[in-house]
């Protein structure tokens, strides 16, 4: 019976010989620990700091915590035990081991050559450590090895030794630093089922010998530097292959017609290569395909018809190619199971493809960055499972129709950069789960949609560059937007003033991420379908496309409208705001000192308003503030002399005649305005200074008077 340790998963089975007893003794025998196995265990414990206190050489090791004596098995499992240091050479003394698992530890250095003594070993798992160097040549002795997991280390070579281990069924060398080409003939690995080397630096031609192994089920060569064409003509034996991943390489040429020989293929990824020409019609014969990724290549011509003629196909990504049209007649088969279609960033033109309405289970559709024209069809309302709809940057016209039925599943809608007119459809209120709404860059004429404020999950609202008009504050309307993180209403015709508490309810922008909640490398969108939300904003003075939006990014852009009155002091509550652009309005009054509370602010643009007073010195303490623009206001006083302000562009302060302190920012050669008397602070004079000034004034007056008197007297006497 295995006794589990409280601080790590530790199981050890050893092949231990049992002392022979006379045949006349009928009572059961007790398994005894062999001394050489016990000593080898103690050596491993000493060098790897195995976390157990019950291993005592004076006690039979069969009773140690985590040790079970078995007459046929020999297993050592020390996974996730926080082991440190190098694998000791003494591990080679455990000669009867059949299973070795040292994964998920902090092991360093090279694998000792003595590991080749474990000639009974069938499974080796060393993944997720910091092991480096070459795979030892002594691995050639591991003729019974069936499973080899070395992924997540720093190995650089020695992989050729594996070509002779004919018992191998699994080889996983992923996430290492292997650099060579796979030149060894692997066709002799007739038991191999899984071969994975993704995220290394392997180079050279595609290893065709892999395709001669009839037992292969899974091949992953992605994220390497393989180059040249790929051909399946001699792969008559690959009838079992289900997974082929070769994305993120330098493969080129045509996708071969011989791909039809992979009759059981289910997952195909050739993305991020240099394949050109048309997709072969023969791919439609691979009837078991469920996921196809051909994105980021140079494919052209007609969109392949297997997209809508397969009953098993679930995921298709054809984005970032040069496809330009659909077939003249598209007939969607009954039972089409497509849930995700990405045709973004191609050159497809013509009207919106209405056949898409017949794909009832469609979950995510991306037709962005093409040349589609005409109106958005009403029939899309019957696609009840829509989660993501991206029609960005086309030439679509007409109104945005009322597509959104009650209990809609829609999470993301992007129709930006088209020619849509009319008003926002009120049916959007049915999209209670929507997080992302982008209608920027159209010709929509409507008032501010206060009614969207009740949507509980709306994070991004992009209304910029349309013809919206009127106030954005209504005391009788609930402003809401409890989850808003990014709002862009720039370049419209909004007017009026904002109350001081206008931003008080935008709680998500004041949320401070802490500990494990920090969304590192997490982006807005659907990760499962690789459909990420994207926006364009003026960021640090430059029009910037955000292909992916970091979850922690918060922005407000109210620029290019006709807002008046004071900037609300409640803006200072939004401590996690990264971008604030209020330029091109008619705001008056002082810059609110509460801006200094926005500790993560990176970009601040208050230019082209009617602001007055001084730039708050406290803004100089914002350590992330890398871009500011205060130009063309009525500001005065000393520019804050902090490091953050000293690195700003000189043009950020132009058009403010009352500002001074430019020398540190603009250099000696720049004209430095001299503060006028009104700009200098007045100090009360002491009594002695006051008397002195009186005497100076009297003397100044007395001199000219005396001179004039002498001249006049001389005239009269003469």
Curated annotation (Swiss-Prot):
- A single Pfam family it belongs to is LRR_14
Q: Give me the Cytoplasmic side stretches, as residue ranges.
A: 717-718
Write down the Gene3D superfamilies for this protein, in alphabetical order: Ribonuclease Inhibitor
Where would you find this protein in the cell? Cell membrane
- Locate the transmembrane regions by residue number: 696-716
| Annotated LRR repeat ranges | 70-94, 95-118, 120-141, 143-165, 166-188, 189-213, 214-238, 239-261, 262-286, 288-310, 312-334, 335-359, 360-383, 384-406, 407-431, 433-454, 455-480, 481-505, 550-574, 575-598, 599-622, 624-647
> Which gene does this sequence derive from?
RLP36
- State the protein's name: Receptor-like protein 36
SMART domains per UniProt: LRR_SD22, LRR_TYP
């Amino acid at each position: 019976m295995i006794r589990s340790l409280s601080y790590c998963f530790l199981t050890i089975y050893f092949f231990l010989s049992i002392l022979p007893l006379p045949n006349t003794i009928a009572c059961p025998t007790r398994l005894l620990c062999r001394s050489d196995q016990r000593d080898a265990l103690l050596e491993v414990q000493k060098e790897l700091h195995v976390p157990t206190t019950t291993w005592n050489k004076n006690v039979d090791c069969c009773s140690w915590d985590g040790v079970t004596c078995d007459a046929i098995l020999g297993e050592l499992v020390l996974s996730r035990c926080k082991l440190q240091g190098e694998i000791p050479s003494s591990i080679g003394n455990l000669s009867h081991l059949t299973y070795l698992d040292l994964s998920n530890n902090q092991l360093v250095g090279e694998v000792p050559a003595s590991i080749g003594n474990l000639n009974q070993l069938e499974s080796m798992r060393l993944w997720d450590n910091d092991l480096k160097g070459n795979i030892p040549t002594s691995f050639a002795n591991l003729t019974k090895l069936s499973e080899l997991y070395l992924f997540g280390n720093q190995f650089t070579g020695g992989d050729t030794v594996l070509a002779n281990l004919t018992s191998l069924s699994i080889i996983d060398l992923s996430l290492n630093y292997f650099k060579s080409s796979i030149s060894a003939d692997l066709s002799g690995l007739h038991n191999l089922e899984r071969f994975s080397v993704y995220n290394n630096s392997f180079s050279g031609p595609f290893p065709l010998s892999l395709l001669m192994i009839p037992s292969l089920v899974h091949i992953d060569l992605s994220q390497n530097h393989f180059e040249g064409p790929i051909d399946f003509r001699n792969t008559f034996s690959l009838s079992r292959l289900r997974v082929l991943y070769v994305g993120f390489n330098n493969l080129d040429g045509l996708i071969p017609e011989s791909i039809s020989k992979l009759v059981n293929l289910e997952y195909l990824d050739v993305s991020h290569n240099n394949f050109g020409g048309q997709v072969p019609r023969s791919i439609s014969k691979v009837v078991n395909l469920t996921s196809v990724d051909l994105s980021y290549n140079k494919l052209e011509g007609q969109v392949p018809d297997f997209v809508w003629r397969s009953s098993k196909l679930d995921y298709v990504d054809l984005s970032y190619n040069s496809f330009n049209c659909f077939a003249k007649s598209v007939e969607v088969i009954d039972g089409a199971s497509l849930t995700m279609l990405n045709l973004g960033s191609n050159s497809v033109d013509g009207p919106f493809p209405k056949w898409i309405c017949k794909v009832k289970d469609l979950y995510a559709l991306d037709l962005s960055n093409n040349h589609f024209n005409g109106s958005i069809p009403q029939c899309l309302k019957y696609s009840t499972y829509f989660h993501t709809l991206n029609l960005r940057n086309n030439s679509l016209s007409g109104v945005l129709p009322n597509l959104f039925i009650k209990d809609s599943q829609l999470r993301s809608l992007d129709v930006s950069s088209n020619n849509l007119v009319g008003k926002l459809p009120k049916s959007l209120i049915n999209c209670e789960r929507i997080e992302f709404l982008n209608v920027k860059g159209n010709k929509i004429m409507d008032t501010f949609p206060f009614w969207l404020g009740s949507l509980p999950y709306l994070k991004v609202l992009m209304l910029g560059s349309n013809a919206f008009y009127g106030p954005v504050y209504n005391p009788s309307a609930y402003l809401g937007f409890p989850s808003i993180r990014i709002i862009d209403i720039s370049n419209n015709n909004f007017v009026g003033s904002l109350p001081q508490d206008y931003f008080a309810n935008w709680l998500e922008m004041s949320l401070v991420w802490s500990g494990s909640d920090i969304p590192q490398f997490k982006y807005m969108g659907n990760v499962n379908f690789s459909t990420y939300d994207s926006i364009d904003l003026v960021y640090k003075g430059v029009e910037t496309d955000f292909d992916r939006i970091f979850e922690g990014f918060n922005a407000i852009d109210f620029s290019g409208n006709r807002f008046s009155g004071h900037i609300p002091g409640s803006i200072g509550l939004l401590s996690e705001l990264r971008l604030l652009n209020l330029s091109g309005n008619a705001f008056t009054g002082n810059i609110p000192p509460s801006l200094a509370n926005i500790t993560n602010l990176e970009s601040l643009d208050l230019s082209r308003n009617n602001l007055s007073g001084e730039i708050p010195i406290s803004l100089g303490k914002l350590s992330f503030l890398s871009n500011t623009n205060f130009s063309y206001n009525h500001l005065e006083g000393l520019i804050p002399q902090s490091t953050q302000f000293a690195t700003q562009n000189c043009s950020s302060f132009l058009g403010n005649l009352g500002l001074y302190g430019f020398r540190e920012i603009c250099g000696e050669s720049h004209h430095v305005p001299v503060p006028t008397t009104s700009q200098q602070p007045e100090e009360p004079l002491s009594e002695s200074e006051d008397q002195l000034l009186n005497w100076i004034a009297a003397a100044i007056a007395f001199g000219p008077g005396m001179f004039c008197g002498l001249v006049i007297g001389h005239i009269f006497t003469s």
